[in-house]
Amino acid sequence: MTSKNKLIYLPLGGAGEIGMNMYLYGYGPKGKERFILADVGVTFPAMDGTPGVDLIMADTKFIQDKADQLDGIFITHAHEDHIGAIGLLWPRLNAPIYCRKFTAVVAKAKMEDRNQSSDMIEILPPYPEMKKVGPFKVGILPVPHSIPEASGLVIETPEQRIIHTGDLKLDPNPVVGEPFNSKLFADLGNKGVDVLVCDSTNIFSNKPGRSEATLVKPIA
């Protein structure tokens, strides 16, 4: 029997571009889908093309019109291109915010800068703990990146498992944050992954990136 539920992946920003990360996941029968949002970022304009513009944000009209179907916002890390618009856009979205502790501190400051209450921010422990949000179960997956407590997301529906990596670097010895846990990713792969949404700058280079640990000695 074919399921009447469908999985939706809609990048509102950040796909095929640098910055303005905002990814919408939906699940459910047509017209009655429930949604979660991964990241609410900004991008910075090119000064020669958009003078006088300070920030650029994604167009949220699609999910604004379905705001009562949005069950949660998950922030992967505290860089501006992933969190920078949270204080500006939250009034249009009006959904709980989930993230790790360091990211929550930054999110709280951005909300309060815009006179928004930060009471809806919930700090989550890392995977294998999972948060039930609507029809989704979401786990916070620690990954190495150039900021504390960067994370990917393990997103499960009753029918699929999605890995949304967030920004990551395969660094076994980062200066900041946790090292890349290849066993954790292998275990997830062995459980079965239906969709991998991978976000990594310079991913098409066939040369390994340098560990950030290599920078310590030159600047010490």
What does each model-found stretch correspond to?
Residues 2-74, 79-220:
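His/Asp/Glu-rich metal-coordinating catalytic cores
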